[in-house]
Amino acid sequence: MAEENQVENSEAAQQSPEFAIQRIYTKDVSFETPNSPAVFQLDWKPEIQLDLDTRSTKLADNTYEVVLSVTVTATVEDKTAFLAEVQQAGIFTIGNLPEAQLAHTIGAFCPTTLFPYARETVASLVNRGSFPQFNLTPVNFEGLYASYVQQRATQENVAQSSETH
């Protein structure tokens, strides 16, 4: 009976979801102030553009690299004040998940984990460029991922309906 419990426990352990952060690191970083020092003389009322992107690569069974790219462009009076680009990456162990849940974890949960690191790097770069304090507002990666899934489903439905006509 003890052997039966051990077999059941080991089977349950094999089937339970697995998630671990192996490493978080800065993959690439760039900061440009193409119009300095003239931009420092302008009235500081910047227009901020934020671009986000994620990509993932399967490294091995249950091991994935997820890269969150954050690009922030500040423009003052039609002049680029600064351009900050950060690629924050992580290596994650993710196992025993259904395909949809795996895609959700890679597309939403991992970027949510990486974002605070990218946010800190961007804030530091902007500060070192001697610009006023800048903090990225939190990003709802769950909502972005849900929109992405819905958009793909719509595109697939359109493609299928055009194939039948």
UniProtKB/Swiss-Prot annotation:
GO terms assigned for molecular function: unfolded protein binding
Location within or outside the cell: Cytoplasm
Biological process according to GO: protein folding; protein tetramerization; protein transport
Keyword annotations from UniProtKB, A to Z: Chaperone, Cytoplasm, Protein transport, Translocation, Transport
InterPro entries documented for this protein: SecB, SecB-like_sf
GO annotation, cellular component aspect: cytoplasm
Annotated coiled-coil segments of the chain: none
Main subcellular location of this protein, as a coarse class: cytoplasm
Protein origin, superkingdom: Bacteria
Entry-linked Pfam families: SecB
Subunit structure: Homotetramer, a dimer of dimers. One homotetramer interacts with 1 SecA dimer.
Family: Belongs to the SecB family.
Biological function: One of the proteins required for the normal export of preproteins out of the cell cytoplasm. It is a molecular chaperone that binds to a subset of precursor proteins, maintaining them in a translocation-competent state. It also specifically binds to its receptor SecA.
Protein name: Protein-export protein SecB
Higher taxonomy: Bacteria, Pseudomonadati, Pseudomonadota, Gammaproteobacteria, Alteromonadales
Recorded name of the encoding gene: secB
